[in-house]
Regions:
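Arg/Lys-rich, positively charged N-terminal/basic patches that mediate binding to nucleic acids
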Residues: 1-35
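Basic/aromatic recognition patch in beta-strand/loop cores that engages polyanionic ligands
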Residues: 40, 47-81
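Short, hydrophobic secondary-structure boundary micro-motifs
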Residues: 31, 53-55, 96
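Structural signal for well-ordered, non-membrane alpha-helices
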Residues: 16-19, 39-46
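Enriched for short, Lys/Arg-rich terminal
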Residues: 70, 74-101
Length: 101
């Protein structure tokens, strides 16, 4: 069963901020490589959303491979929806996204 991904507005803002930061870096194609990595993570989520561990109550956390970012999300099994709560750097404190739930 495949799930559909929905982003909270704040998660969209997180992603926009991250992409902007990578675009400004002097390394060639860094933003493009990040987009590829996070897109791969989203595809995995759609196919196997329960493959990632629960971090807090009903919130799961997916790691973006090769990048220091975590995707926080919760599932709505009834509507087969993945609700992306936040996309944050691993060094950020959980309080930064917990208030979004």
């Amino acid at each position: 069963m495949s799930y559909t991904i929905q982003f909270l507005p704040e998660a969209t803002d997180d992603l926009t901020e991250i992409l902007g930061w990578y675009k400004e870096q002097p390394v060639t194609d860094l933003q493009k490589k990040f987009i590829t990595a996070i897109s791969t993570t989203f595809k995995t989520l759609e196919k196997s959303p329960k493959s990632y561990a629960l971090r807090f109550k009903n919130v799961r956390c997916a790691i973006v491979k090769k990048y220091p970012y975590l995707i926080y999300y919760w599932l709505d099994d009834a509507s087969t929806t993945i609700n992306i709560v936040a996309i944050l750097h691993q060094s950020r404190h959980p309080k930064n996204w917990k208030k979004r739930i």
